[in-house]
UniProtKB/Swiss-Prot annotation:
Pfam family, one: DHDPS
Function per UniProt: Involved in the naphthalene upper catabolic pathway. Catalyzes the transformation of trans-O-hydroxybenzylidenepyruvate (THBPA) to salicylaldehyde and pyruvate. The reaction is reversible. Can also use substrate which carry trans-alpha,beta-unsaturated keto acid side chain and adjacent hydroxyl group such as trans-4-(3-hydroxy-2-thianaphthenyl)-2-oxo-but-3-enoate, trans-4-(3-hydroxy-2-benzofuranyl)-2-oxobut-3-enoate, and trans-4-(3-hydroxy-2-thienyl)-2-oxobut-3-enoate.
Assigned EC number: 4.1.2.45
GO molecular function: 4-hydroxy-tetrahydrodipicolinate synthase activity; aldehyde-lyase activity; trans-o-hydroxybenzylidenepyruvate hydratase-aldolase activity
GO biological process terms, semicolon-separated: naphthalene catabolic process
UniProt-listed CDD domains: CHBPH_aldolase
Alphabetized InterPro entries for the sequence: Aldolase_TIM (IPR013785), DapA-like (IPR002220), HBPHA/CBPHA (IPR048038)
Gene behind this protein: nahE
Xref: SMART domains: DHDPS
Name of protein: Trans-O-hydroxybenzylidenepyruvate hydratase-aldolase
Enzyme superclass (EC): lyase
UniProt keyword list: Aromatic hydrocarbons catabolism, Lyase, Plasmid, Pyruvate
Organism for this UniProt entry: Pseudomonas putida
Gene3D superfamilies according to UniProt: Aldolase class I
Domain of life per record: Bacteria
Amino acid sequence: MLNKVIKTTRLTAEDINGAWTIMPTPSTPDASDWRSTNTVDLDETARIVEELIAAGVNGILSMGTFGECATLTWEEKRDYVSTVVETIRGRVPYFCGTTALNTREVIRQTRELIDIGANGTMLGVPMWVKMDLPTAVQFYRDVAGAVPEAAIAIYANPEAFKFDFPRPFWAEMSKIPQVVTAKYLGIGMLDLDLKLAPNIRFLPHEDDYYAAARINPERITAFWSSGAMCGPATAIMLRDEVERAKSTGDWIKAKAISDDMRAADSTLFPRGDFSEFSKYNIGLEKARMDAAGWLKAGPCRPPYNLVPEDYLVGAQKSGKAWAALHAKYSK
């Protein structure tokens, strides 16, 4: 394992462009057993990273919700990040994930994983006690001050973190130099948030990227993709077609790809309910990936390893639809 790599200049918003894929943390066959240790499939981790880079992704995010940040041991996190960093070898930027239940633990993990070689961290707020706005803002200020060399991607998931990420929050985040990007859900308030946070590169979900780029082509230059874990060709094609459309004004193909993505996702969310999906996010996403067959996500780590069977059927159907898109857009 790498203990340390040579640091580069801290990333800025201008460095965040294109297709940013969010990885799972591949698991060993016994990972659902609480007695198991060392449950990360490091060989599969390295293979996925290499394949993503070969496909042309612009950046990698990890250890979010379906990356199982909540259920990995510290030793597993360290080994996983070391493997990702060793495999990337500086070819694309990489944000690990260090969300935890308190500021001190977040800072400890962030320092160590940045020292290993991650460029930044995708970071949500501690969620045991629901945060108000001043507390959330101070949390990010403290982490940025403690680890000034780390770029921060705000992990803006209201369901996961019991925080709404309101408009004043973004205005305050834009004042923190280390906050360079945000994993962003929905685009209903995007135009206003872009005005409030001029120094942040917002990453809409891949399904929203076409529409978001139409709202503000200059500011919306990147997106996050989980569907790429079912095969990255669709995300890469979307990136390229949106970029082309910005130059030509012809958005027809970009919209068609976006429509394909939305159709493939239609069975992933139980009853179309994001809140219900969020209860089983990890299991549904990993089932989707395994059904697609591009990678081996493996079983979920406890306690989030129980998922209603009919929900899994929808996720698997989505994975197969994404696999078909990957084949279509690989041609």
